[in-house]
């Protein structure tokens, strides 16, 4: 039986992985730091060891006999402002570095890492000449004028988005994104130095039951849900035509189980996505229709640092892991409209 250390086991995605593992031939050692910013003060989770991945001595103890680490522990979300940077660096990057050092000391050579699509930055686009273009970040002047689409840096013409593949340029645009790319870089260097194996799963927009309620660190689907529960119209930024890939948490858990069971060499990054593009406006409308709530409000406002379109190719994950999402966004979001959410007792900013 494969013995797995699961970090972040009390979190949204970690909890679903823990549930999925019960139906597989895996022995799970579940740990979580139970940060107040995520779980509230004094929170505990049944069957989960209270452990911070920055504590190397405790990690080495629980790593004895572990075959694979499934590393979900992280401070998540785009953040509120630059003051969040130390928390991301401490929990995500330093925490991952400590974990990798502890794995080396304990003789554990396989890692499944929760990464994110945010490492791609603006994504990939096609210009009118059929050339692939990596656009510059959108300017405040264009956004203020309601010009939301990415434009060719030379001609100024609007660009068409392309599916993002794993070998696309990595250009993080937020503190959180920078921390996720740093995690990948540490893990890749560790794999080279130790001969270990890393599968970095680049999650796209994850949603599903027990997602945290409306906080600045929640996903947009949960924020739309929270507005509808209060009888308010979901507020959609820009023109609502931003394309994304929404992937159900049950599929994300399945991708992790498949990665734990796979035996790959070196460092491999894989998109975890539904393979079905959908716009943010469509997400809001599906949820509003399913709940019989108010029509979403397209605000025309924007958030600095948001990317316009980011939609993934699912081909490599299917080829490498045999993983293919089973829940398409329209069906999954309709069910999510009435799914239970987790009360976010910890609504403050993450702390170092």
Please describe what each predicted stretch is.
Residues 37-38, 120-123, 210, 280, ...:
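A short beta-to-alpha transition loop/helix N-cap that caps and shapes the active-site region
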Residues 99, 187, 224, 317-318:
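Structural element of the ATP-grasp superfamily
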Residues 182, 186, 190, 220, ...:
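Hydrophobic alpha-helix immediately C-terminal to the catalytic Tyr-X-X-X-Lys motif of short-chain
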Residues 228-352:
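C-terminal substrate-binding subdomain of Rossmann-fold SDR/epimerase-dehydratase oxidoreductases
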